[in-house]
Curated annotation (Swiss-Prot):
Pathway: Lipid metabolism; fatty acid biosynthesis. Its EC number is 2.3.1.180. Homodimer. It catalyses: malonyl-[ACP] + acetyl-CoA + H(+) = 3-oxobutanoyl-[ACP] + CO2 + CoA. GO terms for cellular component: cytoplasm. It is an enzyme of class 2 (transferase). This is Beta-ketoacyl-[acyl-carrier-protein] synthase III.
Length: 319
């Protein structure tokens, strides 16, 4: 069976770190308030010259280097982002150009915080179908540029960053993407959204969120989709070595783990240092755990996320 195997990971963060204490100097909040409600202590904010595509390119370079291949080997680039450099062209094509990659398939996917899972699923399908051999899948965001910095209920939650994986088609063996599951429910599109856009206000807009409603749906949906994808893979929750979740809020991570009966020590947590980086959060957390040695070859991983729309999804991967 032809499978998409993860052969390299990479990540990138802006130069500037912003602690809760620094944020509290300009926003009506405090370190204690943020930590108690979210678990977040730090985030990274893009500065001059740093964009979604530059962060994506840096993460991609590291993933390609880790994979031990040349950029020219990449035949497919999918970039998940809700904060592209421009309305068009796709930021994936900017990454392609920056990496010096010639003719290939390159496009963006937009499913907000679950965008990386959507992009991974598409890449997996294309590899299984034979239309790609090496794929670069990236999640990258600069949410700092769509935040209302006077709204303490949202601006404290988000950060900027990028994460990337290189997938390679391999025949036989038990490594690779075992199963993916995706969902969307547009009835809830006004619970987490940006109040602007080219065809409506002709502005970028600012992020708006009804936090308690999002929390309630997130815990239920994430637990559900994790069970679904494990069933699709013919495995159980007990088989999981590591869950790599979307890093939205420490309380969501803890509540989801409890609902599934998962020990907290099997959940990769980076939200304290990176905050919510939307589509970047899953590949960013994955890269951190690969590079610090927690995730090892042969481990069974479940990646999961939920974002605005609502959209949500999960992937079971034998690393």
């Amino acid at each position: 069976m032809r499978r998409a195997v993860v052969i390299g990971t990479g990540s990138a963060l802006p130069r500037r770190q912003v602690s809760n204490a620094e944020l509290a100097r300009t926003v009506d909040t405090s370190d204690e308030w943020i930590v108690e409600r979210t678990g977040i202590r730090n985030r990274y904010v893009a500065g001059e010259g740093e964009t979604t595509s530059t962060l994506a390119t840096e993460a991609a370079r590291k993933a390609i280097e880790a994979a031990g291949i040349a950029p020219s080997d990449i035949g497919l680039i999918i970039l998940a982002t809700a904060t592209p450099d421009q309305t068009f062209p796709a930021s994936a094509t900017m990454v392609q150009a920056a990496l010096g990659i010639g003719d290939c398939v390159a496009f963006d996917v937009q499913a907000v915080c679950s965008g990386f899972l959507y992009a991974l699923s598409v890449a997996d399908s294309m590899i299984r179908g034979g239309s790609a051999t090496h794929a670069l899948v990236i999640g990258a965001e600069t949410f700092s540029r769509i935040l209302d910095w006077e709204d303490r209920t949202t601006c404290v939650l988000f950060g900027d960053g990028a994460g990337a994986v290189v997938l390679k088609a391999e025949e036989g063996g038990d490594r690779g993407v075992l199963a993916t599951r995706l969902h969307a429910d547009g009835r809830h599109n006004q619970l987490l959204y940006v109040d602007g856009g080219p065809s409506t206000t002709q502005t970028v807009g600012k992020l708006r969120m009804k936090g308690q409603e999002v929390f309630r749906h997130a815990v239920t949906n994430l637990a559900q989709v994790l069970r679904e994808v494990m069933g699709d893979a013919g495995l159980t929750v007990d088989d999981i070595d590591w869950v790599v979740p979307h890093q939205a809020n420490r309380r969501i991570l803890d509540a989801t783990a409890r609902k599934l009966g998962l020990p907290a020590e099997r959940v990769i947590v980076t939200v304290d240092q990176h905050a919510n980086t939307s589509a970047a959060s899953v590949p960013l957390a994955l890269d951190v755990a690969v590079r610090d040695g927690r995730i090892k070859p042969g481990d069974l991983l479940v990646l999961e996320a939920m974002g605005g729309g609502f959209t949500w999804g999960a992937a079971a991967i034998r690393y």
